[in-house]
Curated annotation (Swiss-Prot):
Domain (HTH cro/C1-type): residue spans on this chain: 19-71
Presence of the UniProt keyword Zinc in the record: no
Free-text domain note: The helix-turn-helix (HTH) motif in the cytoplasmic domain of the N-terminus is involved in the formation of spirals to maintain the rigid rod shape. As this protein is anchored in the cytoplasmic membrane, the HTH motif may contribute to protein-protein interactions to form the RodZ helix, which is localized beneath the cytoplasmic membrane. The C-terminal domain may be critical for determination of the rod shape by probably interacting with enzymes required for synthesis of the peptidoglycan layer, including PBPs in the periplasm.
Name of the coding gene: rodZ
Gene3D superfamilies: lambda repressor-like DNA-binding domains (1.10.260.40)
Superkingdom of the source species: Bacteria
UniProt protein name: Cytoskeleton protein RodZ
MF annotations from Gene Ontology: DNA binding
Membrane disposition: Single-pass type II membrane protein
A Pfam match: RodZ_C
Length: 337
């Protein structure tokens, strides 16, 4: 009867109560049990109070209970029914590996996207640099070509200018070259001895025929006004050229340019005549006149200041783009591209 009563009493007690009673019978404290089982005191307390910690897996809890039972000399078979209720086996939740694979796939995709972005950026920078270099090279080649053309034209013009005086000097009559001293001597004689002017009609007419109009102009300009009275009544006065005496009138379409640095320039008027083509140095200036409109090509727009009809010409659009300036200056309107 006593054995059956003891068995029923053990079945009525929970696993934790049985372990606590056995510990107290052996005179052990919770601290001692915890040190022997290498557990926390709170874990031993939870086991005796039949509590299952939330952060502790059921497999570990069952192992701790078995170790506790062996320590207090309780057969494990007697605790198995209570273990099924207190710490039932639960399937462990295995974290899916999909998240890792997804993260790896996302990281790989982000890497490809970043690589593609950098590749596109490098391509854009390379194309921009190539375009700028080609444009700059084309401008330099154009300036060089225009400079070569202008130098060739200047050399051809200089050769033609040198050949003209040589031809005129060879075709000049020697008699005409010797005439000016004679006229000068005659003038000097007239100014020194007025009494000798009476025999002037006896001069050989061939000498008068040799004198050219230009030489006559020189003589009349050199002799004073009273010499006209000394000439004989029968001789007609020589014609004088009054065109050289008139003062030149300023052209309203004059083109004035001042240079602050070395600059290549070409100016053409409406007739196609090149008023200037070549290199201008720093601190130089040009004053050109011709038939409007003028066509200008300027290699360095920032190095020149232009005034047309008394007004400055705006070259800021060419200076900003750093390009060769091509513009037309009309007679009655503002400069046009």
């Amino acid at each position: 009867m006593n054995t059956e009563a003891t068995h029923d009493q053990n079945e009525a007690l929970t696993t934790g109560a049985r372990l606590r009673n056995a510990r107290e019978q052996l005179g052990l404290s919770q601290q001692a049990v915890a040190e022997r089982l290498c557990l926390k005191v709170s874990t031993v307390r939870d086991i005796e109070e039949d509590k299952a910690p939330a952060d502790l897996a059921s497999t570990f809890l069952r192992g701790y209970i078995r170790s506790y039972a062996r320590l207090v000399h309780i057969p494990e078979e007697e605790l198995l029914p209570g273990l099924e209720k207190q710490a039932p086996l639960r399937a462990a939740k295995v974290a899916p590996m999909q998240s890792f694979s997804l993260g790896k796939r996302r990281k790989k995709r982000d890497g490809w996207l970043m690589t593609f972005t950098w590749l596109v950026l490098f391509v854009v920078i390379g194309l921009s640099g190539a375009w700028w270099w080609q444009d700059h090279k084309a401008q330099q080649e154009e300036i060089t070509t225009m400079a070569d053309q202008s130098s060739a034209e200047l050399s051809s013009n200089s050769e033609q200018g040198q050949s003209v005086p040589l031809n005129t000097s060879t075709t000049t009559d020697p008699a005409t070259t010797s005439t000016p001293p004679a006229s000068v001597d005659t003038t000097a004689t007239n100014t020194q001895t007025p009494a000798v002017t009476a025999p002037a009609p006896a001069v050989d007419p061939q000498q008068n025929a040799v004198v050219s109009p230009s030489q006559a102009n020189v003589d009349t300009a050199a002799t004073p006004a009273p010499t006209a009275a000394t000439t004989p009544d029968g001789a007609a006065p020589l014609p004088t050229d009054q065109a050289g005496v008139t003062t030149p009138v300023a052209d309203p379409n004059a083109l004035v340019m001042n240079f602050t640095a070395d600059c290549w320039l070409e100016v053409t008027d409406a007739t196609g005549k090149k008023l200037f083509s070549g290199m201008q140095r720093k601190d130089g200036n040009l004053n050109l006149t011709g038939q409007a409109p003028y066509k200008l090509k300027i290699g360095a727009p920032a190095a020149v200041q232009i005034q047309y009809q008394g007004k400055p010409v705006d070259l800021s659009r060419f200076i900003r783009t750093n390009q060769v300036a091509r513009l037309t200056l009309n007679a009655e309107q503002s400069p046009a591209q």
